[in-house]
Amino acid sequence: MCPRHRHSCRQVLASLLLLAAFSGGPPLSGAGSTSADATTPFLRDALQGFDRWDADHDGTLVLREIDLAIASPEVTAGQAAAAVALRRVAGNRRKPVTSFTRESIRALATVARVDDSPAWQEDSGSARSATLETCYADALEKITSTPRDLFIDGQPRLAGCRQGRLGSCFSLAPLTALVNRDPQAVVRLFRAEEDGSITVLLGGGATPVTIAPLTDGELALTSSTGGNGVWIALYEKAVGQFRAAGKAGATPSTPLATVTRGGSAGTMISVLTGNAIRRFSCAPWREPLADSATQAARLGELRSLLRSGTADRRLMTAGTSATTRKVPGLARKHAYAVLGYDAATDLVTVRDPHGQTFEPAGETGLENGYAVREGIFRVPVPEIVQFMSGFAFQRETPASPAKHADPSVATDAGASGDE
């Protein structure tokens, strides 16, 4: 058998094994039975775009090639939606697919299940099992229906902000805290250039980052505002470009591929504002031998930080880690905006970048979760320290360049790292 035929046979066998893995059954006996209808919109656009996306022409699409297709302004409409669908199944938590051939795309088109739903959807039972076809349809609907205006109502609104398909909560938590504090300050972050590019003024205006307009694929993956403009998506792209530029010697990456790797929400406060931060760790509530006197003193310290941060209208964030307590309706390895603190009730007001609504199945608290409305929920101070890993508070003093040059600390994707 010639090498070309052996390569084709290996591709078909790999496709059959992928199909069996996703369908839960044994490998099928014939290649023909793995073929989905080639006239379906997803298959049509994915297969038409395949050769152009396959940069090294080896007959296989890897994640970097898909990311480059999503970042390309030449990949539009249905083909952009198809690339986004492949990117989503590649990012599966339980069964990620690291590469695609034409045969495997046909095999996976209707059987691959995408498990990238936020934790709150899984907790509420509202998680939707998506296929490549439904991911394609969702992406195409967003591409065709979203206005590309920077701000539609003159200024940003917190209501309607929803994290997209990226692990970008670390960048969204400080941004949405700023929207809550001063919407016009967010407007001042953006400057439209004559050539159509957009400059995002990070570091309190000292660090301008100029980016190209969103591609169709980028629009489909990034966060949304509920019809309030694409400012939040442009910010995510700018953060990704800023981070990629700060990694000398690293393998080149697209802005969205960089931003989805996660980072520190606290460090992002410095990146956004140019100010230093103060961190507060909740580690004493995860240590079995921690004494109550230490915990009581630390609660007093946290209340003082929350009280002054609220009074001075400074940005505040909090975050969970992979090892913090799981609370129904909320995610681990996730960053949150802290919107304020009420000393009279001892309640902290927090916003999840996902912007969800969640109703606890029982009494509100650590066991059943908290009532969440458009991402906003309130938690007593003695309870919030039991599931957050830490907090970060904006300070009035400027940050040193080394402190806000790169927000990518050693954290899990989407984690806040605020300890």
Give the positions of each predicted feature.
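Bacterial N-terminal signal peptides that target proteins for export
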Residues: 2-13
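Compositionally biased, intrinsically disordered/low-complexity regions enriched for serine, proline
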Residues: 3, 23-24, 252, 281
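Intrinsically disordered, low-complexity segments enriched in proline/serine/threonine
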Residues: 5, 28-29, 382, 409
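Bacterial N-terminal signal peptides
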Residues: 12-24
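Signal peptide processing junction and immediate N-terminal pro/mature segment
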Residues: 24-34
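Structured alpha-helical subdomains that flank or immediately precede key functional sites
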Residues: 34-57, 62-419
